[in-house]
């Protein structure tokens, strides 16, 4: 080998060695940084929450219990109530009140008829305010009755400081209350929608669609909707979400991500005003990346409830007439990667 070739080979080896050293010393630092929760000042949102979607445990909270307006993120509750309480092929007619709903709206005149399924898609993908009103009236008769239904649902879900007045999230006041929730409650509602509701699969399908086309009942008028939840294309595993904005609420967002057996939910309130439309995406990414880096899921072996065999129990008509097997529970733990905090829950 010539001296020149030896020199080139030596240079390549030296460069490779330097690159390896850089990776060796900087990667752990970056990993440790990712495992640290964001400083409150690093997030644009006034209120922000990261939740373990599996257990409902709050992993990170910035002003998570503060009552704030939440704009169109309200529609996730309107959606799940409609899915649970009506036939999607049911026909609904646009009322005079619904036709007056402000933009963003479908713009259908009073008297026009649609299938409930199509109205739900239009509400969740395009965030049409008039569609939310039609849905509320179809489910409960009036928006006032639907408001009561929403608040009853919120209480059953476990919300602690939520009071909804409008089905679309438009700012409103009633008596001494204003339309509001908290970031923690909003995450709880999303968890119900994607994990606990008997219609969770339908909710995920609707909110995960990129676009949707439909017509009114007459077939004369066609509509095409696009999903404005940009987060669905931002991170692998993003499965659902809803944006929101009003002058009082600012930009709001609630979204969910599933990856490696873990589900994370982010809820953001008052995350900037025009021209800060992208702040919510920045905050969502930071919180999701923190969750993915700092926490992991560990499956545990099946264990007997008390570690011993239960006494045989006679069962009428059972084969052999008795049951004497152990009762097992499947457990898994969502724990921080430094093993400092463990959460066990039934799987």
Pin down the residues of each PLM region:
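Sec-dependent signal peptide recognition
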Residues: 12-20
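Active-site-adjacent loops and short helices of periplasmic peptidoglycan-processing enzymes
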Residues: 31-201
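N-terminal secretory signal peptides that target proteins for export/translocation
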Residues: 1-10
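Domain-terminus/edge residues, biased toward the C-terminal soluble/receptor-binding domains
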Residues: 159-160, 175-347
């Amino acid at each position: 080998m010539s001296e020149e070739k030896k020199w080139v080979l030596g240079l390549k080896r030296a460069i490779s060695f330097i690159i390896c050293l850089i990776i060796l010393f900087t990667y752990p630092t970056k990993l440790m940084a990712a495992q640290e929760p964001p400083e409150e000042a690093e997030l644009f949102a006034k209120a922000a929450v990261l939740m373990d979607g599996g257990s409902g445990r709050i992993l990170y909270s910035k002003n998570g219990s503060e009552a704030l307006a939440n704009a169109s993120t309200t529609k996730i509750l309107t959606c799940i109530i409609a899915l649970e309480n009506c036939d999607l092929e049911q026909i609904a007619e646009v009322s005079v009140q619904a036709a007056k709903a402000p933009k963003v709206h479908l713009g259908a005149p009073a008297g026009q008829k649609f299938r409930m399924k199509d109205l739900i898609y239009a509400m969740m993908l395009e965030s049409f305010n008039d569609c939310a009103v039609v849905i509320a009236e179809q489910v409960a008769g009036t928006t006032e009755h639907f408001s009561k239904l929403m608040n009853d649902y919120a209480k059953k879900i476990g919300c602690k400081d939520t009071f909804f007045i409008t089905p679309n999230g438009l700012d409103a006041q009633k008596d001494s209350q204003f339309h509001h929730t908290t970031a923690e409650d909003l995450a709880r509602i999303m968890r119900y929608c994607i994990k606990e509701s008997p219609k969770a699969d339908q909710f995920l399908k609707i909110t995960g669609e990129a676009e949707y086309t439909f017509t009114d009942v007459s077939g004369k008028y066609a509509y095409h909707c696009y999903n404005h939840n940009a987060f669905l294309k931002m991170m692998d595993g993003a499965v659902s979400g809803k944006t929101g904005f009003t002058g009082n609420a600012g930009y709001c967002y609630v979204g969910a991500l599933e990856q490696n057996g873990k589900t994370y939910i982010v809820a953001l309130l008052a995350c900037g005003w025009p021209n800060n439309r992208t702040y919510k995406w920045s905050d969502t990414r930071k919180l999701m990346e923190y969750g993915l880096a700092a926490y992991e899921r560990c499956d545990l072996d099946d264990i007997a409830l008390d570690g011993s065999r239960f006494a045989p129990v006679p069962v009428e008509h059972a084969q052999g007439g008795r049951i004497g097997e152990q009762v097992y529970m499947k457990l898994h733990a969502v724990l921080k990667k430094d093993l400092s905090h463990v959460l066990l829950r039934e799987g």
